[in-house]
């Protein structure tokens, strides 16, 4: 009986020493104040650019099969509104179909 009381008392002392109360000392995160800043960027809400105009998103380009595509001019990447995807009529037709699907899922407002 005495041995079990000694074991329990020792266990409680170890627990108290090993796990101090949170109230006894504030941790560093409790002392700091955290803020979050939300920045809202205005984006195009309607199709306003024609084929050949520079763009950043599909929503900016006007037309069901017109997308904001990337071309390389002098080794430099340029984004512009385009609907032609190939010189081949068959491939161009397939490309316009893909552009239409891409515009459908762009969720432009």
UniProtKB/Swiss-Prot annotation:
Main subcellular location: secreted
Cell location: Secreted
Tissue: Expressed by the venom gland.
GO cellular component: extracellular region
Keyword check for Signal: yes
Domain of life where this protein originates: Eukaryota
Sample GO molecular function, one term: ion channel regulator activity
Disulfide partners: 55-68, 59-108, 61-81
Key words of the record: Disulfide bond, Ion channel impairing toxin, Knottin, Secreted, Signal, Toxin
Keyword DNA-binding tagged: no
Prosegment residue ranges: 19-46
Signal sequence range: 1-18
Swiss-Prot/TrEMBL domain comment: The presence of a 'disulfide through disulfide knot' structurally defines this protein as a knottin.
Family: Belongs to the neurotoxin 25 family. F7 subfamily.
Function: Putative ion channel inhibitor.
Record protein name field: Hainantoxin-XVIII-4
């Amino acid at each position: 009986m005495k041995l079990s009381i000694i074991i329990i008392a020792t266990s409680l002392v170890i627990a108290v020493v090993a796990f101090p109360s949170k109230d006894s000392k504030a941790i560093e995160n409790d002392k700091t104040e955290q803020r979050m800043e939300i920045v809202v960027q205005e984006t195009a809400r309607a199709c306003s650019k024609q084929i050949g105009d520079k763009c950043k998103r599909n929503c900016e380009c006007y037309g069901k099969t017109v997308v904001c595509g990337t071309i390389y001019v002098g080794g430099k990447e340029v984004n512009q509104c385009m609907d032609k995807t190939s010189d081949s009529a068959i491939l161009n037709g397939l490309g316009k179909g893909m552009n239409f699907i891409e515009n459908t899922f762009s969720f432009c407002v």
